[in-house]
Amino acid sequence: MHVQDRHGRPVMSLRLSITGRCNVNCIYCHRDGMTSSRGELSAADIEKLCRVASDLGVGKIRLSGGEPLIRDDIVEIVERINNIGFRDISITTNGTLLEGYSAALSEAGLDRVNVSFDTLNPETYRFITRKDYLERVKSGITSAVDVGLDPVKINMVILRGVNHHEVWDMFEFCREKGAVLQIIELLKTESCHDDAVERYHCDITPIEAELAEMADRIRTRKFMQDRKKYYIDGGEIEVVRPMDNTRFCANCTRLRVTPDGKLKPCLLRNDNLVDTRDALRENDTGRLRELFFEAIRRRSPYYTP
């Protein structure tokens, strides 16, 4: 049984940002390749939070960052979470370290992976990330598919004047690899600064109209913010459109955790966080449950009709 917030939305998944560190420096992210691990939750503390979440009916865990594979204990973290008994464990990664970890992560209990990968063009990749890791990422995607992580999804943020013309090339790449393409509208968040949104935000309505015209079948995923999935010639494309999207909020089922242990009721807000660090230090499970309920109580749609 899922706990519901005061708007009737069930809390079904927990997304833990387990590090703010990253080994790339993307043009739309203001974290600037952060390198400090200060304040990050330990693997044991991550397990404590996940156990409380499981007791409250959460069935899905996603690990993200920063770049989660930077953590030396990432396999241990997945093992600890898997031992709790969640039905789905996933990771969002930039893919640069994935080839070396995919087999161990799969064995530890990881079910699936999302790879942030915005372009197949080496020069464009270097422009976006300020690194030359494109071939590493492609090898990581191949490795993830080969070890049986399923699905492997490619997160492609559409950037005006940068990669907006590459959607079909990326679709062909994904179809060939057996991966699912997710095209994502650039969203203003704590990690994406205003200048980047103003400079690179691209209205993806024309792309979605083209997908609708070409699709053999279209599916609407209610508990994934009513996002559309388009099936085209044996391939799949999902469209993620959070900007000013009331359905994105109305069907949100996710609670988030920051790298330093704050429960985050809303992706787009930082003024209503719930700090769990004292309860974690004191190993106070009862207090952690209370804090989860408080975070759920604070959940409110950011975009409203």
Swiss-Prot record:
Cofactor binding notes: Binds 2 [4Fe-4S] clusters. Binds 1 [4Fe-4S] cluster coordinated with 3 cysteines and an exchangeable S-adenosyl-L-methionine and 1 [4Fe-4S] cluster coordinated with 3 cysteines and the GTP-derived substrate.
Pfam family of the protein (one): Mob_synth_C
Keywords: 4Fe-4S, GTP-binding, Iron, Iron-sulfur, Lyase, Metal-binding, Molybdenum cofactor biosynthesis, Nucleotide-binding, S-adenosyl-L-methionine
Binding site for [4Fe-4S] cluster 1: C22, C26, C29
MF term (GO), any: GTP binding
The keyword Lipid metabolism belongs to this UniProt entry's keyword annotation: no
GO-annotated biological processes: Mo-molybdopterin cofactor biosynthetic process
Database matches in PROSITE patterns: MOAA_NIFB_PQQE (PS01305), RADICAL_SAM (PS51918)
Pathway: Cofactor biosynthesis; molybdopterin biosynthesis
Cofactor: [4Fe-4S] cluster
Domain of life: Archaea
Catalytic activity: GTP + AH2 + S-adenosyl-L-methionine = (8S)-3',8-cyclo-7,8-dihydroguanosine 5'-triphosphate + 5'-deoxyadenosine + L-methionine + A + H(+)
Domain Radical SAM core: 6-233
HAMAP family (alphabetical): MoaA_A (MF_01225_A)
Family: Belongs to the radical SAM superfamily. MoaA family.
Function: Catalyzes the cyclization of GTP to (8S)-3',8-cyclo-7,8-dihydroguanosine 5'-triphosphate.
Name the UniProt record assigns to this protein: Probable GTP 3',8-cyclase
